[in-house]
UniProtKB/Swiss-Prot annotation:
The keyword Transferase applies. It comes from the Bacteria. Keywords: Arginine metabolism, Cytoplasm, Transferase. It catalyses: carbamoyl phosphate + L-ornithine = L-citrulline + phosphate + H(+). One of its GO terms (biological process) is arginine catabolic process to ornithine. NCBIfam families: orni_carb_tr, PRK01713.1. It comes from Burkholderia pseudomallei (strain K96243). This is Ornithine carbamoyltransferase, catabolic.
Length: 336
C-alpha cells in the first residue's frame, strides 16, 4: 500500500496508519543523524509557517521554530495578545486569511474542535501542537525516544501511563500504542480513564495491529515488567487551589517514586515525562503545592529522586520533539 504525506494535516494520529507513523519515525531518526553529523540539507526553502499559540509553550514553540529554521523555512509566532483571534475575528476567518499567506499552520490551544475547524477552512496543512484531547507531536517524540532506549522491536515494547488518563497524554499514548501494536498500560482511578467510546476505538485499532491494551486502577499492576513509565502533571497553572485537594488525593497512589519504579522488576525501566514537571518546589506552582501539602515538597507526580536519576530520559524526549516535528514538516511540505 502506497501513501503520500504531502499536504497532510496532523490533527490527532487517528487518520495516520501504522506505516505512515513508522515512516515519520524513521525520517525523524535520519534527520537527527544528519543534524548531528552536519550533513542536513534544507528542504523547506521559501516556505512560511504560522504558529498559533493560544496556550503558552516552551518545548513546542522552540521545537517548531528550530525545526523550521534548520530546514530553511520562516515562521511567524501568533499569540492572543498579538492577534485578533477570538476577539474580533473567528477561527474560521483566521484560517481563511492565514491559508492565503502561509504554506502551513501550527495550532496549540484548547478544544480539538478548534484545530479541526482551522484545518477545514485553511486550505493548507494544519499541525496540532496540543489540544485538550490530543498531543500528536509529543507522541512521535515519545515513541522515537522509546525506540532509542530499547533494543526491542516496537511490538515488544511495554509502557505504562500513570495519572489523569482523560487528558491529551493519556488519550494519545493509548492511541499511538494501539496503532503501532505496542503493549500499553493505563494506571488511573476509573473516574479518570479515557472516554469509553475512545477506548473502544483504540481497541479496534489494537485488534488490527496486535497491540495489548490494559486499563487498571492498580498502579503496580500497570507497571509490572514495563520498559517505560510515563506521567504528566496533576494540576495546571490557573486551576483554583480548591480543585487540587480532590485531584491530588485521587492520584497520590500513582506517584512515580522509587518504590513504584523498582516494583517493575525491570532494572532497565526508564522514566518519561512530557514536561514541565513538578518534581520539586522550585517553581511557583510547585511551591504553592508544597506549602499546602508539605509531604509533596520533594515531588508531586514524580519524586525528585526518580526525576534526577539515570532512569529519567525526559530531556532526550524533549529534544526529540524537534526532530519529529521536523520530520512532519519535511514530509508534509518538502515533497519527499
Amino acid at each position: 500500500m502506497s501513501f503520500n504525506l504531502h499536504n497532510r494535516n496532523l490533527l490527532s494520529l487517528i487518520h495516520h496508519n501504522a506505516r505512515e507513523l513508522r515512516y515519520l519515525l524513521d525520517l525523524a531518526r535520519d534527520l537527527k543523524r544528519a543534524k548531528y553529523s552536519g550533513t542536513e540539507q534544507p528542504r523547506l526553502l521559501r516556505k512560511n509557517i504560522a504558529l498559533i499559540f493560544e496556550k503558552t509553550s516552551t518545548r513546542t514553540r522552540c521545537a517548531f521554530e528550530v525545526a523550521a529554521y534548520d530546514q530553511g523555512a520562516n515562521v511567524t509566532y501568533i499569540d492572543p495578545a498579538s492577534s485578533q483571534i477570538g476577539h474580533k475575528e473567528s477561527m474560521r476567518d483566521t484560517a481563511r486569511v492565514l491559508g492565503r499567506m502561509y504554506d502551513a499552520i501550527e495550532y496549540r490551544g484548547f478544544s480539538q474542535e478548534i484545530v479541526e475547524e482551522l484545518a477545514h477552512h485553511a486550505g493548507v496543512p494544519v499541525f496540532n501542537g496540543l489540544t485538550d484531547e490530543y498531543h500528536p507531536t509529543q507522541m512521535l517524540a515519545d515513541v522515537m525516544t522509546m525506540r532509542e532506549h530499547s533494543d526491542k522491536p516496537l511490538h515488544d515494547i511495554r509502557y505504562a501511563y500513570l495519572g489523569d488518563a482523560r487528558n491529551n497524554m493519556g488519550n494519545s499514548l493509548l492511541l499511538i500504542g494501539a496503532k503501532l501494536g505496542m503493549d500499553v498500560r493505563i494506571g488511573a482511578p476509573k473516574s479518570l480513564w479515557p472516554a469509553a467510546d475512545f477506548i473502544a476505538q483504540c481497541e479496534a485499532f489494537a485488534a488490527e495491529s496486535g497491540a495489548r491494551l490494559t486499563l487498571t486502577e492498580d498502579p503496580y499492576e500497570a507497571v509490572k515488567g514495563v520498559d517505560f513509565i510515563h506521567t504528566d502533571v496533576w494540576v495546571s497553572m490557573g486551576e483554583p487551589v480548591e480543585a487540587w485537594d480532590e485531584r491530588i488525593n485521587a492520584l497520590l497512589p500513582y506517584q512515580v517514586n522509587r518504590k513504584l519504579i523498582e516494583s517493575t522488576g525491570n532494572p532497565r525501566t526508564r522514566f518519561m515525562h512530557c514536561l514541565p514537571s513538578f518534581h520539586n518546589c522550585e517553581t511557583k506552582v510547585g511551591k504553592q503545592i508544597a506549602e499546602r501539602y508539605p509531604h509533596l515538597k520533594d515531588g508531586i507526580e514524580v519524586t525528585d529522586e526518580v526525576f534526577e536519576s539515570p532512569r529519567c530520559i525526559a530531556f532526550e524526549q524533549a529534544e526529540n520533539r524537534m526532530h519529529t516535528i521536523k520530520a512532519v514538516l519535511v514530509s508534509t511540505l518538502g515533497g519527499i
